[in-house]
């Protein structure tokens, strides 16, 4: 913000700062984005805090620092309340930030387990990059796509497939069309 205010002042030929409009708002909020165990957080701990309002250790996804208790997300609360839930992301859908809304893992790198928890969530919509580590050979379950389909998800590759299937699908996952 300070750099933008200095740049704006320089463009107008003024030495110093030219306040941006939001810097003049009458109220200010302060957020502390550190993890429970480190001053600098990662996206798993930050996503967990965003999704649940609870701090956790870096690297942990949807779990409390005691390493035993799940941090219930607002998306899970909405689902329990009978609401339809959708999760959208620009990254792989089983990465830390989107995963923090439906998964509970001691390691953000448990992509296979995170994918399985996506399928178990019952959320009606997921959209994002494909599954990371979708075909982990250590597991004999057919991979993340098959697990999701076996759980009743329709997988749409691209917007045209989404439009063709959205009305009839109870649960759908939208991924970019592969070239």
Sequence positions of predicted segments:
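Active-site-adjacent mobile loop/cap segments within catalytic or ligand-binding domains
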Residues: 176-179
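N-terminal catalytic scaffold of extracellular/periplasmic and nuclease hydrolases
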Residues: 1-137, 142-166, 170-171
């Amino acid at each position: 913000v300070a750099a933008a205010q200095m740049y704006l002042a320089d463009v107008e030929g003024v030495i110093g700062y030219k306040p941006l409009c939001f810097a003049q708002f009458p109220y200010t909020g302060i957020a502390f984005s550190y993890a429970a165990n480190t001053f600098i957080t990662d996206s798993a701990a930050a996503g967990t805090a965003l999704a649940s309002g609870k701090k956790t250790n870096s690297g942990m996804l949807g779990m409390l620092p005691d390493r035993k208790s799940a941090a219930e997300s607002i998306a899970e609360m909405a689902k329990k309340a009978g609401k339809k839930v959708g999760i959208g992301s620009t990254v792989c859908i089983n990465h830390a930030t989107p995963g923090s809304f439906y998964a509970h893992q001691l390691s953000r790198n448990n992509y296979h387990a995170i994918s399985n928890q996506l399928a178990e969530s019952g959320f009606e919509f997921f959209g994002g990059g494909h599954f990371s580590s979708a075909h982990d050979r250590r597991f004999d379950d057919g991979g993340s796509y098959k697990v999701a389909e076996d759980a009743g998800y329709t997988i749409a590759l691209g917007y045209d497939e989404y439009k063709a299937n959205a009305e009839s699908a109870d649960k759908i996952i939208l991924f970019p069309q592969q070239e």
